Amino acid sequence: MQQAPVVLSTLDKLLNWGRSNSLWPLTYGLACCAIEMMATGGSRFDFDRFGTIFRASPRQSDVMIIAGTLTKKHAEFMRRLYDQMPEPKWVISMGSCANTGGMFNTYATVQGADRIIPVDIYLPGCAPRPETLQYALMVLQDKIRRSKAIKQDAPKRLV
């Protein structure tokens, strides 16, 4: 097993620290869970202390929080927003409806956001409390800190 150079591992930690403490979620509220998501931005829960600022543009976001029931009409639009987000990007699926379709088992409902885009963290509940979303953000921060910021599988130059 080949070890990464000391300089790269230190740079890795620095990049991951910066990324984990500056998460900008894309607000993608679809139903009741969106109200709980908005509550986390209020003064009582204060998402800003984690370095988290809600963004309305996917080009300024690195986290997508899917909050609510996802219909098949919305699925294509959500995929397009996800594709517009810069790398690295993460997804939090918030609530039973976003996770599994919830109680809406119909032809028009997507039975889980992970059928459309990859999901990193699932929040159970109907609707999950703001504290749960804060905890999910802290779990995501830990996941980012443990990941490799610098990819070793970069294409090799021939010349």
From Swiss-Prot:
Gene3D superfamilies for the chain: 3.40.50.12280
Binding site for [4Fe-4S] cluster: C32, C33, C97, C126
Cofactor: how and how many bound: Binds 1 [4Fe-4S] cluster.
Cofactor(s) needed by this chain: [4Fe-4S] cluster
Membrane topology designation: Peripheral membrane protein
Location of this chain's protein in the cell: Cell inner membrane
Any one GO MF annotation of this record: 4 iron, 4 sulfur cluster binding
EC number: 7.1.1.-
BP terms from Gene Ontology: aerobic respiration; electron transport coupled proton transport
Organism this protein belongs to: Helicobacter acinonychis (strain Sheeba)
InterPro entries: NADH_UbQ_OxRdtase-like_20kDa (IPR006137), NADH_UQ_OxRdtase_20Kd_su (IPR006138)
GO cellular component labels: plasma membrane; respiratory chain complex I
Keyword tags: 4Fe-4S, Cell inner membrane, Cell membrane, Iron, Iron-sulfur, Membrane, Metal-binding, NAD, Quinone, Translocase, Transport, Ubiquinone
Cysteine-cysteine disulfides: none
Family: Belongs to the complex I 20 kDa subunit family.
Main function: NDH-1 shuttles electrons from NADH, via FMN and iron-sulfur (Fe-S) centers, to quinones in the respiratory chain. The immediate electron acceptor for the enzyme in this species is believed to be ubiquinone. Couples the redox reaction to proton translocation (for every two electrons transferred, four hydrogen ions are translocated across the cytoplasmic membrane), and thus conserves the redox energy in a proton gradient.
Superkingdom of origin organism: Bacteria
UniProt catalytic activity: a quinone + NADH + 5 H(+)(in) = a quinol + NAD(+) + 4 H(+)(out)
Enzyme class (EC, first level): translocase
Protein name: NADH-quinone oxidoreductase subunit B
Coiled-coil regions listed: none
